[in-house]
Amino acid sequence: MMAPSTEDPETVVEAQRRGSFSKKNGNGWTKPGLANGSESKHMEPVTGTNALMAAIDADDQETKLKDPLEKEASTYKSATDRFFQSSHPPSHQTVENPIKLEPPTSSGVTQNGSPVTNSLVPEAAQPLQTVAESSEPTAASAEPTDASSAESSTITVTPVVPVVKFTNQTTPNGSTVATSVGQNVRLTINGKRVGRPPGTFKRPPNNPTTNTSHGEETDSEASTDLICRWKDCMLKFANLKGLVEHVQEKHVQSTEQEHHAWRCEWEGCDRNETFKALYMLIVHVRRHTGEKPNKCEYPGCGKEYSRLENLKTHRRTHTGEKPYKCEFSDCEKAFSNASDRAKHQNRTHSNLKPYSCQIGGCQKSYTDPSSLRKHIKAVHGDEEYEKAKKSRPPNYSNRRRPDHRMPPPTSAMSHPYLAPPHVLPPVAAPGVHQQNFINLALAQHHHNQRAQFIANNAALMDPNGSGAAQAAAAAQAAQAQQAQMYQAQAMQQHQFAAQMQQQAVMQVHMQQAALQQAQVAIIQNNLLSTQGIMNQFPMMSPLLTPRAPGNVMSLLQQQQVTPPTPTMMQLTPHTPITPITPITPLTPMGATTGPMFSMPNIMMTTPVRMDIPTSVPAAVPVAPVAPVAPVAPAAPVAPPASSLAEATEPRFRLLRQHMEGAEVAPVLAPQQPLEEDDDMTDDEESGNVAPAVIRNGDGPDDRNSGTGSSSPRSSASSGSGTLEVAGSVAQNGNRSSSTGERGMRSFLIADILQMAHDFQNGRIITDALHKAIFDTSDVTAMFHIYRTFECVCEYLQFTFSAGERLPTWPEVRTIHEYYHSDYDRTRFHASETVRRRDNLFWRFVNYCNSDLPIGGRPILSVSYDEGFEESIDQGSNFGTIPQQLISRMAAEAFDDEDDGFDDAFDIPGLRLGGVEVLIQQQRHRVRRAALKQAQIDYPTAEEDLGYVGGGFGQEDDDHHSYAIYEQQKTVAFVDLSEKPKVEVLTDEDFMEQFKAAEARCQARLAIEPMVKVARTVINGKVVEYTESQLFSPPVSRRTIYSMLKQFPEHQENLLKFITLHVDKCELENVIPSREYMSDMESSFFAHHRIVRAALRARGEITEAEEAEYQQSSNLMYNQDFAALMFPELDESHDDFLNDLPISSRRRSSDSDSKEAPSMKKPRSF
C-alpha cells in the first residue's frame, strides 16, 4: 500500500484512526508490525506511536485465547487506556493555559489492563522521554518563538506523553474530546485554542512580503528597489536615506500636496482616499519606501518599525508588560497588544465567525481578519489575496469587541469552530448579576454532565461492577459539593448587590444634607458680605458651620480672630454672590427697634425724615460703646457706670436724620429745586451715562436746568444720604423718594461709620467713600456724602493707619469726573469731544516725532483726528528737546531689552525714550494689585473681562507682552481649569487645596519677597514708604470666569473697582493718563518731567542738562505753545461745545429737542 501524502490531512486522520499506518521518524509511512520478540529485533527503534500500536496488537493477540466476555472487557479497557493516555497535554503546553485530562483514578475506577500492556507502557515511556528531550532543541530552533511568551511562560514536558497531533471529535452525548491524528498540531479544547506552530498547512507566497511581529506588512522590494515611483517621477537613488529625503521634500510635503489634500500618488498604491492629516500620509509612504525610523534600543535587538506604535508594542516583548486585559469579567488573560486581545475575545468568548471568505466555492469563516488573510494567502494564492485586498468587505477591518448580543459560552468543553458561521441568536443583554448567575448555572450543569459521563464510562471499564459503585458515589459527592459552592457564590453576589443599593441610598441622603448645610452657610456669608465690600479683601476661608448669631456686631468682632469668609467682591469660586439688603429700621426718635440686617423678603419700617443742622454739634457728647465680647486688636475704653443705659443705643443716633436733611455746604453755589422723577425705568437708567463734563477746578457744566442734579437716582441719594452697597435689585416701580423699596436696599452711612469706629479700621471708611463715588452720579449728592465722612472723622479724631488717609475733595472730584463724565468706556471714541481729549497726549508725542528726516513717523492719521495735520504743521517750528538728544534716543526707542520689555510692548513711532513704557509699567502694577485683591488670576483676567488698558476697560490695546512677561515672574495660584470639573466642591476638598496653595505661596514669599513702593500725601508733603506685597489667596479661575459671564453686574463692578485703583494711583503719584488729562498745562509739564527723569535714569543727560531742558520747556510753553497745539481747548472756539452730547439725564419730554443749550460759565466748588 502506498503511503498517503502529508498534504492530505483527512487521509492521514482516517489512516491513523484505523491504525493502518504509523509515522516512523517523521520520514515515511510503514506497516506496523506485531510486538513479538522475533520481529522487534529487525524493526526501527521503538517510538511513542509504535509502542502504543504494539501494545494494542499484543492485547488483541492475548484476548483471542480468553473467554468472549473477558475479551470484550479487555478490549474496552485497552481502548480506555489509549484514550486517557492520548489525552495528556503535549510538550508545548504552557502554564498559562493548563489542560489536564487524566483518567479518573481518584474516583475509584481501576485500570486493570493486560499484562502485556502494563509491561509495555513503561518500556514505551522511557524512549519517548528520551525522544522528547532530544527533539526539543530542534523544535525550538525550527519554530520562531515569541520573546514575550518565552519570558512569561514555562514549557512543561510530560515524560509519558508523545508529541502528537490533536483534533476535536464529538461524542454521541455532545461533549468534545481530543484524539491524536499526527504531529505538529496544537491542542484546542474547552473552547480555547492552544496554538498552532507557524507554517502548518501554509504554502510559501509567490511575492514575499516583510511581515512584522504585529501584523504590519511591507513590500520586500522596497528595501532593494531604490526608485521613486511617485507620479511622473522615476528617480533612482544610491541609498535609502536619499530616497526618503527626496520623497518627503519633493512629494509629500510639497506645496502641490496641499492642493491635493494629502493624497498618495505612489505607483500601484491601492489607497484611493485622501488622508486627514500630513502625519498620516508620512507614515503611509513608509510602506512604499521601506523606511523604518523607529528602532529598538535594547542591546542585541535589531528590530525596526515604520510606525512608533509597533515599536512600543515590540518593547513589551522585552519588558513583559501586558496592559491589554480581557474585557470579560470572568477572564484574567492579558496581552501585549490590542490585536491579540481582540483575537482572544473573538475566539474564546464568542462562537461567531463574522469574517468569511468571499471567494466562490469557499465556505470558510474566521473570528478575526488576520486569520482570514492567512487563509486566502495560503489556500487561494496571492492573486486572490490582492483582489480581496482591493475589494474589502465592510466588516474586513472592524475590530470585534465584546458584544452584548453574543451568547455566553455554552459549554466548558465547547469550541468556537463547532458553531455555524453567521449565526446571531436573538438574545437580550442580561445584567451583570444575571449573567454571573447564568454562568454559574451553566458551569454546574456541565459539571453534572461530566460526572455522569465518568460514571457511565466506569461501567464500561469495569464490567464486573467492582468500581462502578465507588465511581457513582464519588461523582455524587463531587456533584453535591460543587452545587453547594455555586449556591454560596450566588448568595454572596446577592448580598453584594443589596449592599451597593444601600450605599446609593445613603449617598443620596448625604447629598441632600450637604445641600441644606450649604444653603444655611450661604445665608450666613451673605450677612457678612457687607464688611467684605469695605475691608481689605482678606484671605479666603471655607464656609462657616451653621450657627445662629446673637447680633451682627458681635459676629463681626468674632470674625477678627476667626478665618474671614468670602465676600461679594472676592467672587468666591464655590458660593454664588447673593446680594443682601441691609437696613436699619428707625423710630421717630432714632432708636433701633430691630436687627441691623434683614433679608429682602422681610418688610421693615421705613426710615423717618427729620430736619437737623447741617453739621454735627460739638456740644453733644456721645459716650463710646463697648462692643459685645470685645476681641483684638484693642478693646474700647469702658464707659462710666452712669452711661451704661445709653451705651446700648447707636453712637450716631442723630446722624441718620442729619443725612436725611442735609443741605449744601456754604462753599457751594445756591442750588435750584430738584427735578421731579420721570418715567425712566431702572433698565433705561442703567444704560445711560451722566455726562457732567467738568474740568479740574470747575463746577458741573449742566445742560438741563442748570442745577447739576437732575437724576431721580441722584435725588434719592441726595435726599436720603444713603450709599448703595448691596448690588442691583430688580424694581418695577418708580423710585420717587427714599421710602418703600428704596429703603429696602440702602445702607445708612451711619452704620458704616459706626463699624469703622468700633473696629478702628480706616479701610472701611475709604472703601465706602470710593463705593459712593461709583453709585452717586450727581456731584452735589456726592459732596453731601463726602462732607459727612469728613465731619465725622474730624469729630471722632479718627486715626488712619500708615499710608492711609481720607481723600481730599479735589481728589474725590477728579475721580468722580472719570466715571460720571461723557467719557463712556464701553464705547471708545464715541464723540468728537472724547476723541479730542484722547488726542492730547498723542499730539504731544507726534510733535516730538515731527522731525521727519530722522525717520520719525506720526502715529495718528487724518481719519482718526481731523485736526492732526494742522497741529503738526503749526508745532513743527517749536523744539522741546535738542536735536542731538532725539537722535541718540531714536535707536533706543525700538531696542530696549535692558528695560525688561520686548519690542512688541513699545508703540511704533514713539521716540521719547520710553515715556509710554514708564506710564504702562505703573498701570500694570496697579492693575495687577487690584485684580489680586478681587481674587482674580490676573494673567487671564484680560481675556475674561476684556483688556483693561489705562484703567478704562474694553479698550483695544495690543500691549499684551508685558502681561506675559510678568506672568513668568509671578507666583502661580491654584488653577482648576485642567482638573476634572466638579459640580459641588466640599469644604474638606477646598480646605486641602487652600492649605496646599497657601503653603506654596508662603514658601515662595520667603524666598522672593515682593516689595512695592507707594506714595502718599501727609501734611502737604509727598512721602514714600515700602511694604511687603501680600499674596492673594488661591482661587479657581474657571469658577470666576463662569460667574462673571452669568452675572454681568459683577463684571461691571469689577471693572469699576480695577479702574478706581488705577486712577487713584495716577492721582497720588502724579502720573498723567494718556486717555485724559486734567488740564493741558499739567499734562505738558508732566510729560516733559517724565522724559527728563527717564533720560536721567539712563545716563543720557546730566543734572545740568536736565535743568537746561526744564527751562527750555518753560520757555516753549510761555510762547503760547498750547494755543497752537490744542486750539480746540480754547472756549472761544465756535465748535468746541457744539459737539458735546446732550445730557442723558434730562427729561424724556425733551428728547426730541434739537435746540443748542445755553452756555453758562462753570461754577467752582
Swiss-Prot record:
Q: Name the keywords, alphabetized.
A: Cytoplasm, Developmental protein, Differentiation, DNA-binding, Metal-binding, Nucleus, Repeat, Sexual differentiation, Spermatogenesis, Zinc, Zinc-finger
What task does this protein carry out?
Plays a major role in controlling sexual phenotype. Terminal global regulator in a well-characterized cascade of sex-determining genes. Promotes female development. Interacts with tra-2 to promote spermatogenesis. Promotes spermatogenesis through the Tip60 HAT complex and by regulating the expression of genes, such as fog-3, required for male development. Association with chromatin and at the fog-3 promoter requires wdr-5.1, and may also require wdr-5.2. With trr-1, activates the fog-3 gene to determine sperm/oocyte cell fate.
Effect of inactivating the gene = Null mutants exhibit strong masculinization and male mating behavior. XX male mutants are infertile, produce sperm from day one of adulthood, but by day three of adulthood, switch from spermatogenesis to oogenesis and produce irregular oocytes. Mutants display early somatic gonad precursor lineage defects, whereby Z1 precursors divide with reverse polarity and Z4 precursors migrate prematurely. Most animals rectify these defects to produce normal male somatic gonad.
Q: Name one Pfam family in it.
A: zf-C2H2_15
Quote the biased-composition stretches of kind Low complexity, using this chain's numbering.
Answer: 132-145, 705-721
Q: Please tell me the species this chain comes from.
A: Caenorhabditis briggsae
Q: Where is this region: Disordered?
A: 1-44, 58-154, 190-221, 378-415, 663-741, 1137-1165
Zinc finger annotations (C2H2-type) as residue ranges: 226-251, 262-288, 294-318, 324-349, 355-380
Q: What is known of its domains?
A: Only isoform a is thought to bind DNA. Zinc fingers 3, 4 and 5 are the most important for DNA binding; removal of finger 5 almost abolishes DNA binding and prevents the selection of binding sites.
Originating gene: tra-1
What GO cellular-component annotations does this UniProt entry give?
cytoplasm; nucleus
The protein here is known as Sex-determining transformer protein 1
